[in-house]
Amino acid sequence: MKPILLQGHERSITQIKYNREGDLLFTVAKDPIVNVWYSVNGERLGTYMGHTGAVWCVDADWDTKHVLTGSADNSCRLWDCETGKQLALLKTNSAVRTCGFDFGGNIIMFSTDKQMGYQCFVSFFDLRDPSQIDNNEPYMKIPCNDSKITSAVWGPLGECIIAGHESGELNQYSAKSGEVLVNVKEHSRQINDIQLSRDMTMFVTASKDNTAKLFDSTTLEHQKTFRTERPVNSAALSPNYDHVVLGGGQEAMDVTTTSTRIGKFEARFFHLAFEEEFGRVKGHFGPINSVAFHPDGKSYSSGGEDGYVRIHYFDPQYFEFEFEA
């Protein structure tokens, strides 16, 4: 399995994301550049220039018309996907940690960090109302007083958002009223990543407590646990197999004191039902910060602390592989 290597960032990758069809791959890093690539051959299509700090999150809407990015320069920006033109600039008081379009692409949400004396907020904007964008006034703002949000996604049908916190808590906030619908605490440490399944019925969380866990999207009922010996930075569900891929590794500050072999910087594949590991893919030098499955399930990508993104197309053996219970 020879990967395609994407070199478009000078700093550590923070998030990678495919669009719905999977023909484009968006990558953001701890530099101000937002890149978009053809996923089939790794050719760089273009960049979205404008941010002045590390970019923490990226999302594309349903029909890949708009791209949304959130950055440590205290702004969330909306871009025209095709032309790279900046359509909106939403200023915040602290860094934007997570962002996302709802199912219809009309409503955006983003969460800000708890820093510099400012509270962590989740803001909701309706793109159909230009006055909200012009006046930088969201139609709803949810304060998070206890522990800041470290990852968030829209729930099924855009009725709620699912948010993971620094404390390991998982919340479901209503997108209509802003109230907390469900609250669970299955992780003991920070939740680094949340990714939904293709049909949005379940999602996987990746946590600093060395586990990834599977939950039901509507009830937040905990279903499966995937254990490793290292903090898990990202986890993604296969769209057509019962497989989950985990990416992680040591904290950046511990990395220099160990060899890469001890660091365990592989992408690890687990069976969804049996919670058993069945494969690993080496390659990155340093921890893996973000993983994503292609929507057709025939390839996956990973972005690492080394600043590289690798696109892996699965070998035929992967598709013939039968897991023996």
Curated annotation (Swiss-Prot):
The modification Phosphothreonine is found at residue 219. Phosphorylated by TGF-beta type II receptor. The modification N6-acetyllysine is found at residue 264. It holds the Pfam family EIF3I. Keywords: Acetylation, Cytoplasm, Initiation factor, Isopeptide bond, Phosphoprotein, Protein biosynthesis, Repeat, Ubl conjugation, WD repeat. WD repeats lie at residues 1-39, 43-81, 87-127, 135-175, 180-217, 221-267, 275-316. It is found in: Cytoplasm. This is Eukaryotic translation initiation factor 3 subunit I. The lineage of its organism: Eukaryota, Metazoa, Chordata, Craniata, Vertebrata.
